[in-house]
Amino acid sequence: MGQTLFAPNATKSGTMIKLHKHDLPDGLDLGSVVAVDTETMGLNPHRDRLCLVQLSAGDGNAHCVQIIPETLGGRGADCPNLKRLLANPDQVKLFHFARFDVAILRQALGVEVAPVRCTKVAAKLVRTFTERHGLKDLLRELVGVDISKQQQSSDWGAPELTPEQLAYAASDVLYLHALWARLEGLLIREGRLELAEACFRFLPARGQLDLMGYEDPDIFAH
């Protein structure tokens, strides 16, 4: 059974955040485009463990799957429903900075996430007049939503996550559908949608290259 939380002050009024231990429940339908994000102990996928996977169908609700290692009484990578969704070729996974997320999900769960879209890549392709491509900036400027980043560096490996942590985690997926709609319009306007789609198809391979140590120096650098 999942734990249901309401966090109107941290996200938006009426938002439902559902916390699931270990895996998504059977029969959950999140639609054809699913916003996804991850929380980890750090930014090194070889060292830092995956702690939380957040998902949203774009309906104002968020589902958070807490990944608990077997050494701490959990099930580790035994999350068949989550992995089935991540690998489902008929469900698009929508990320912000997919490069990191697809790498950590491959490393932690052994799953290749596809197909994917990335709002950060899309923003960099069309918002060439600015360096503001972070999620907070994009949501404020394109969607009119101001999210808090106060819990960004908190302890995501804690056995019990606080309502504030879950509200922060949920905010990273609740508005991605709306953001993508704006960015897709800009990609079409600037004639760069096909280029963006080519970049998105490459992202799983980019994540695998990073895991193999090709991120520094970058294999595409001179």
Regions found by a protein language model. Name each.
Residues 1-222:
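DEDD superfamily 3′-5′ metal-dependent exonuclease/proofreading module
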